A protein has these predicted regions:
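N-terminal signal peptide c-region/cleavage motif recognized by signal peptidases
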Residues: 19-21
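The canonical Cys-X-X-Cys-His
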Residues: 42, 49-58, 102-103, 118-122
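Bacterial N-terminal signal peptides that target proteins for export
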Residues: 1-11
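Electrostatic cytochrome c docking/interface patches
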Residues: 24-47
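Axial heme c-ligation environment in periplasmic c-type cytochrome domains
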Residues: 63-71, 90-128
Length: 128
């Protein structure tokens, strides 16, 4: 192998090594349903008719309900499906933080599509 070939291989290897840490830091793509529009709608519902802010705080960092921004999922795996199921069904008192239950849909009259939007917003908070 001549000098030019070895130099080319060395440069290519250095480029791959340099790209490695950047590629490792990329977060996985959000699941279908977690779109900017769904997140914005969910944010609005969370802070208004969904009443989520009453227990999770206006910054979603928790009050009587748990912090939703720390990527620590207390009752499941943090997947979008898990969040949808949790918002839909709630959390019983015996499993809830501080023993305060989360009623289904947070006790508010939100639709299935609104539940999905809230779930997209919550997903975005815990998967930064």
């Amino acid at each position: 192998m001549d000098f030019r070939s070895r130099l080319g291989l060395l440069v290519a290897a250095a480029a791959l090594l340099a790209a490695g840490p950047v590629a490792a830091q990329e977060k996985p793509a959000a699941p279908a349903g977690v779109t900017p529009a769904a997140i914005a709608q969910g944010d609005s519902i969370f802070h208004t008719k969904g009443l989520c802010y009453a227990c999770h705080g206006t910054n979603a960092q928790g009050t009587v309900g748990p912090n939703l921004t720390d990527a620590e999922w207390l009752h499941g795996d943090g997947s979008l499906d898990f969040i949808v199921a949790t918002v839909t069904s709630g959390i019983p008192a015996e499993k809830a933080k501080k023993g305060v239950p989360m009623p289904p849909k947070g006790g508010s009259a939100i639709t299935e599509d609104e539940v999905k939007a809230v779930a997209a917003y919550v997903y975005s908070l815990g998967h930064k």
